[in-house]
């Protein structure tokens, strides 16, 4: 049975992410902000895509919580499996990647990722909501509830597919507009871009494996059992 406190926590997190998405959508209507959201609108930034991803995940999680309390676990195995797959392959790796990549680049040279002019446009609290608080929230999910991991091949393949899709969008936007989503890309040669994207995947794949280790450390082996061949 899902604990009431965990259900309440999931609902509060869902409300928080829903509020952030709504607030940012309203901010985009301000006359000062269209330049930031132009050429691909909100969906060119991994930060904002991550907020949407977390909202979807916690929406699924809340639905799973409610149905478990009303119907029991047997009737919603598919939903629980989807919840776990979404968290293990996307929600945890992406939010942790956004947190680490943003602050590493910010501390090295903020102009590569978040130019100072954005301080006059984006409130400090919103910056931290998008880039800082996402990590303790996703880490809390690891601690509060066990998640069944797929095989490494399946998990890393799904993560690679999502990474390729996002990189393809970045490149498409550049060829369409002549402007890079993030300033750091303008500093790199073609070879440098290839290396950056490759290392980014290695980084996020390492985060995926770390999530699996943390889950195993806290809850034991939760990997999905392999189907026996007939």
UniProtKB/Swiss-Prot annotation:
For this UniProt record, give its keywords in alphabetical order, as a comma-separated list. Cell membrane, Hydrolase, Lipid metabolism, Membrane, Transmembrane, Transmembrane helix
**Which signals induce this protein?**
By androgens.
The record's GO molecular-function terms, alphabetically, read: hydrolase activity
Tell me where it mainly resides.
Answer: membrane
Q: At which residues is there a site annotated Important for catalytic activity?
A: 47, 131
Q: Name one GO biological process term.
A: long-chain fatty acid catabolic process
Q: Where in the cell is it found?
A: Cell membrane
Cite a GO CC annotation. Answer: membrane
Tissue pattern of expression reads: Expressed in cultured endothelial cells and in placenta.
EC number in record: 3.1.-.-
Query: Catalyzes what?
Result: 9-hexadecanoyloxy-octadecanoate + H2O = 9-hydroxy-octadecanoate + hexadecanoate + H(+); 12-hexadecanoyloxy-octadecanoate + H2O = 12-hydroxyoctadecanoate + hexadecanoate + H(+); 9-(9Z-hexadecenoyloxy)-octadecanoate + H2O = (9Z)-hexadecenoate + 9-hydroxy-octadecanoate + H(+); 12-(9Z-hexadecenoyloxy)-octadecanoate + H2O = 12-hydroxyoctadecanoate + (9Z)-hexadecenoate + H(+)
Residue numbers on the Cytoplasmic membrane side? 1-3, 68-85, 141-154, 211-230
User: In terms of domain of life, where is this protein from?
Assistant: Eukaryota
Coiled-coil ranges per UniProt: none
- Substitution effect: residue 131 to A: Loss of hydrolase activity
What is the membrane topology listed in the Swiss-Prot or TrEMBL record? Multi-pass membrane protein
Q: Which residues cross the membrane?
A: 4-24, 47-67, 86-106, 120-140, 155-175, 190-210
Keyword Ligase among record annotations? no
Xref: Pfam families: Far-17a_AIG1 (PF04750)
**Role description:** Hydrolyzes bioactive fatty-acid esters of hydroxy-fatty acids (FAHFAs), but not other major classes of lipids. Show a preference for FAHFAs with branching distal from the carboxylate head group of the lipids. Regulates the expression and the cell-associated anticoagulant activity of the inhibitor TFPI in endothelial cells (in vitro).
What protein family is recorded? Belongs to the AIG1 family.
- Put simply, this protein is called Androgen-dependent TFPI-regulating protein
User: Organism source for this protein?
Assistant: Homo sapiens
């Amino acid at each position: 049975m899902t604990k009431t406190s965990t259900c309440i926590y999931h609902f509060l997190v869902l409300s928080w992410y829903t509020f952030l998405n709504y607030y940012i959508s309203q901010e985009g209507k301000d006359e000062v902000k269209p330049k930031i959201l132009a050429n691909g609108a909100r969906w060119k930034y991994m930060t904002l895509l991550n907020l949407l991803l977390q909202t979807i995940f916690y929406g699924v999680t809340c639905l799973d919580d409610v149905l478990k309390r009303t119907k029991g676990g047997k009737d919603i195995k598919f939903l629980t499996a989807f919840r776990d797959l979404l968290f293990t392959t996307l929600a945890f790796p992406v939010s942790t990647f956004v947190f680490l990549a943003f602050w590493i680049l910010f501390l090295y040279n903020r102009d590569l990722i978040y130019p100072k002019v954005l301080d006059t446009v984006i409130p400090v609290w919103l910056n931290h909501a998008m880039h800082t608080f996402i990590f303790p929230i996703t880490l809390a999910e690891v601690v509060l509830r066990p998640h069944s991991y797929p095989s490494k091949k399946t998990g890393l393949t799904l993560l690679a597919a999502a990474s390729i899709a996002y990189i393809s969008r970045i490149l498409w936007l550049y060829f369409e507009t002549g402007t890079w989503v993030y300033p750091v890309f303008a500093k790199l040669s073609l070879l440098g871009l290839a290396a950056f994207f490759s290392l980014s995947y290695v980084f996020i794949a390492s985060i995926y494996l770390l999530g699996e280790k943390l889950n195993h450390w806290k809850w034991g082996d939760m990997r999905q059992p392999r189907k026996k061949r007939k």
